[in-house]
A protein has these predicted regions:
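ATP/NTP phosphate-donor binding region
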Residues: 1-81
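A short, small-residue-rich loop immediately preceding and capping a beta-strand
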Residues: 75-98, 102-113
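Predominant activation on well-ordered alpha-helical scaffold segments within soluble catalytic domains
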Residues: 15, 43, 69-72, 164-175, ...
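Fold-independent oxyanion-binding glycine-rich loops
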Residues: 8, 31-32, 86-88, 109-112, ...
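A glycine/threonine-rich phosphate-anchoring loop and its flanking beta-alpha core
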Residues: 102-196
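Active-site nucleophile and cofactor-binding loops and adjacent substrate-binding regions
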Residues: 60, 86-88, 239-243
Length: 243
C-alpha cells in the first residue's frame, strides 16, 4: 500500500520521503492548473536540499498513448529517480503508465479528489478521440501527498464526483466478492470497503459546502482521505482476476 501524508504542510515531508528511496533527481509532471496549485509548495520544500528538479512538464489533457510517450521519451524523466505526478486522474494515470516502461518510482499529488487514482495500481488509457482504449497495471504510487487546501480550492464538481465514486465502492466490492471463497487479500479489501461509506455520510455535506467556499477544513480532509486512501487501498486489495 502507498504511504501518504496529509495536511496543508504535507510537502515539508517530501525531502525525507525522497531520501528514503535515495532519490536526488526528480521530474514533476501534471496538468497546467495542477502545477500552478502544487508547484509553489513543492519547490519551497525542496529549496536548500540536494534534490534537483530536472524538469517541470505539462503532460497534456488526457492519458493517451501519445502523452504517455512524451513522458517516456523525456530525457529528464529518464534520468529522474522519482516522478512526481500532480493533478487529477488523467494526469496521474499518464505518469503511472509511463513509469512502467521507465521503471521509475512515482509520488502522487492529487490536486482534485474526484477518484482514487493517486493511490491505485491501475490506470485508464484513452484513445486520441477520448474513447476508452483500456487499462494499464502500474506499480502503486510509493507516496501520496494530500493537501486539503489545494483540494478545497479546486472546482467543487470534482469533490462532488469523488464523493459519488467513493460511495459506490462498498456495494461494488460486496457484489464483486459475493460468490465467497475469498483469498486473504481480497477479504482484507472487502473489510476495508466497509469503511468507505460512513465518512461520506458524516462529513460529505459539510465538506462540499466548504469546498464551494474554497475553505480547507477537517471535513474536507476526511473526505479527501476517504476518496483517495480508503477507496484506493480497496482497489489495490481487490483488483484481482476473479473479482
Amino acid at each position: 500500500m502507498s504511504d501518504y501524508t496529509v495536511g496543508e504542510d504535507c510537502f515539508t515531508e517530501l525531502p525525507a520521503a525522497l531520501a528514503e528511496y535515495g532519490a536526488t533527481k526528480v521530474a514533476i509532471i501534471g496538468g497546467k492548473r495542477a502545477l500552478a496549485a502544487a508547484l509553489p509548495g513543492i519547490e519551497a520544500a525542496l529549496e536548500d536540499t540536494d534534490v534537483e528538479v530536472l524538469e517541470t512538464r505539462v503532460y497534456g489533457t488526457n492519458s493517451t498513448r501519445a502523452n504517455i510517450a512524451k513522458v517516456v521519451n523525456s530525457p529528464a524523466c529518464q534520468e529522474a529517480d522519482v516522478l512526481i505526478a500532480c493533478g487529477g486522474g488523467k494526469a496521474l494515470d499518464t505518469v503511472k503508465t509511463a513509469a512502467i516502461e521507465l521503471k521509475k518510482i512515482v509520488f502522487t499529488v492529487p490536486t482534485i479528489c474526484s477518484n482514487c487514482s493517486a493511490a491505485t495500481a491501475i490506470a485508464v488509457v484513452y484513445n486520441d478521440d477520448g474513447s476508452l482504449e483500456g487499462y494499464s497495471y502500474p506499480n502503486r504510487p510509493a507516496r501520496i501527498f494530500i493537501n486539503p487546501k489545494i483540494i478545497a480550492e479546486a472546482p467543487a464538481e470534482y469533490f462532488w464526483a469523488g464523493v459519488g465514486d467513493a460511495l459506490s465502492k462498498q456495494p461494488e466490492v460486496e457484489y464483486a466478492t459475493s460468490a465467497g471463497n475469498l483469498e486473504h487479500t481480497a477479504g482484507l479489501g472487502l473489510a476495508l470497503a466497509h469503511t468507505c461509506s460512513e465518512p461520506l455520510f458524516t462529513y460529505g455535506v459539510q465538506g462540499l459546502e466548504y469546498v464551494r467556499l474554497d475553505l480547507s477544513t477537517e471535513a474536507v480532509k476526511q473526505i479527501a482521505l476517504d476518496i483517495v486512501v480508503n477507496t484506493g487501498y480497496v482497489s489495490n486489495l481487490t483488483n484481482q482476476n476473479d473479482y
